[in-house]
């Protein structure tokens, strides 16, 4: 019943002294080779992080999301996005992706979300609130998860997150679409790095 994780980031993403703007991009050739080797029926899902924690929160380009999800769709594999660190990723897309510099953060978020079958996140990291959520596109998948909710969260009809927490999360999501707010973290880190270099 076991399984294993395959890390399929591009080799260039592991080079620390590099100007590559999206070091978190998935290597599509590695993804295809992995599916070929394991067999699509043996791949439960393809999971991407928006802001790749494994390599220091490096951002993923919208094109990489699109390409990876297209491969997953082609092979009938569920595509899953961990959007917990999406705010920083959105910031870097907005400033580094020429095609999306004039798009709103909200429109970029929609473009990313449209690619995936499932999105989950910790609201503490994305949304500035306690709690989290799992979003699914397929109603059958949604219903298949209902039996698991009482074991981890609360009953479907009550319990779980309070209205206050849901309200705080809603405000946090709205703030996460504001470039001034999502730029704080990356700009603070850049400031600290620049001071250390000086």
Task: Describe the residue ranges of each PLM region.
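Conserved PLP-enzyme active-site core in the AAT-like
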Residues: 1-198
């Amino acid at each position: 019943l076991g399984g294993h994780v395959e890390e399929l980031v591009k080799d260039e993403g592991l080079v620390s002294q590099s100007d590559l703007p999206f070091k978190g991009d998935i290597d599509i050739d590695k993804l295809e080779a992995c599916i070929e080797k394991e067999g699509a029926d043996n791949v439960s899902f393809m999971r991407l992080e928006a802001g790749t924690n494994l390599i220091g929160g490096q951002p993923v380009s919208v094109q990489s999301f699109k390409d990876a999800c297209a491969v997953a769709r082609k092979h009938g594999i569920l595509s899953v996005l961990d959007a917990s660190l999406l705010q920083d990723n959105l910031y870097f897309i907005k400033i580094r992706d020429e095609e999306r510099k004039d798009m709103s953060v909200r429109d970029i978020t929609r473009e990313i979300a449209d690619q995936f079958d499932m999105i989950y996140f910790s609201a503490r990291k994305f949304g500035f609130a306690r709690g989290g959520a799992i979003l699914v596109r397929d109603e059958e998948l949604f219903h298949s998860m209902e039996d698991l909710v009482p074991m981890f969260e609360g009953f479907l009809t009550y319990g779980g997150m309070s209205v206050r927490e849901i309200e705080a999360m809603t405000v946090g999501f709205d703030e996460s679409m504001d470039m001034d707010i999502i730029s704080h973290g990356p700009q603070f880190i850049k400031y600290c790095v620049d001071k250390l270099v000086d």
